[in-house]
């Protein structure tokens, strides 16, 4: 069928899910993979490019917030940001390779900020009791500054302490499932006002990222914009990526097809249109011809864009199958 090649991981008897985990104990998480390997299965959607531009040299300060429900691609996007920070040269080369395909020469000039350490975590996994535990554990200078914090006998780290640590090693903190984690925090934990302390520390990180972007980038994902978790970040006028742009649906389809097939983009639109012409004509006759106002060419283009699936099946794959967690 026009030489279309399914990616190897989908050729077995049991198809894996495509849900992304930033890190897994078996080192099979998205951030555990080599950047070239992960970028190979990544399609540069408009939202992803917007997020990458938030990492550019000379960028404005402030948090970056990804807003969207299940299956929107937030975790995949965050994994790309992680690799971009830790491997900027590889990411810039990848962008350059896509510049001609997308007819966007500006991608050749997109330069990722250098010198940051990415610290990424699906925070709702609850591997850490507090955000500062995560930072002290993963940051290159974390052990020293953890000692300073413990010696201070304070209930949360001082802003000056965190700024010193970030100044020694600039940091990009990426927190997936931030709202899920925050909403589940208890009011009290081991005598500590856990939610209040988290609220205060989030505010601190947001302010540092706004006022001192040269030492801290702060990126989180939330499900919606009416939660306490989001409102705390909203004070610092974050960049919002909401997956609701004009091209979001088409981008999502292209992302899925690129994720499933190795060479879908290498097959010409003319060949696809020729192959699907009869089906597209009958689909239009059965579903749209009685409505009077449907654009036949637009409907045919929709069929070509979704090939090798029908538009209805691709929607089903996205909603019910591909976005489920692998068993």
Where in the sequence are the language-model features?
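Short glycine-rich substrate-engagement loop in P-loop NTPases that contacts/grips substrate
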Residues: 127-162
